[in-house]
Amino acid sequence: MRNRILVSACAALAMFAMQAPAHAAATDQLQSFVTGVKSARGEFTQRQVKGQGANVKVTGTSSGTFVFSRPGKFTWRYTKPYEQLLQADGQTLYIYDKDLNQVTERKLDGALGSSPAAILFGSNDLDKNFVVRNGPTRDGVEWLELTPKAKDTQFERIGIGFKAGNLEAMELRDAFGNTTLLTFTGMQKNPPLAADAFRFTVPKGADVMKQ
């Protein structure tokens, strides 16, 4: 389930009521992120929640680290409570489940599509894949709501929160009402990365499945 957050995705935790054009400041922060941040690294916490408002209940929490280089190169590593790795080299997405010692390979173009991963790790053609709408400001974080234009996606909305030009969080809700909140900390923008930083090596003895 966890890897679906990136490769097939979800949508907004907050059901934004306002449908006006997005605030210029929030839009500028989003555009600045997708065009100005060519690479980054940091840490994330991922929470699965149910309910809304005061009735929100956390049903699961995981955390880990990430690093990416646009377009299409990234490492998304879960470290708690279980280890799992999602890594892409620009052409292929590799999903490694340590407990099963199993690697799943997917063509990257089909795996990203109009997903949250496309926003974080893809190119900067957001207008091609999403409709951007205004969201609220909560605790100093300005939110945008992105709705995929494609009809065959597995999610409804993606909420993106920025503060002082930094990506703070993503709120995701899928078509089945499942909700995921991603929060980001310690993000370093445009750090130097080794040429082979995203080269995937199949772990010894691992089974490989191609999709």
From Swiss-Prot:
Keywords: Chaperone, Periplasm, Protein transport, Signal, Transport. The keyword Repeat does not apply. One of its GO terms (biological process) is lipoprotein localization to outer membrane. Residues 1-24 form the signal peptide. SUPFAM superfamilies: Prokaryotic lipoproteins and lipoprotein localization factors. It is found in: Periplasm. Belongs to the LolA family. Monomer. This is Outer-membrane lipoprotein carrier protein. It comes from Cupriavidus taiwanensis (strain DSM 17343 / BCRC 17206 / CCUG 44338 / CIP 107171 / LMG 19424 / R1).
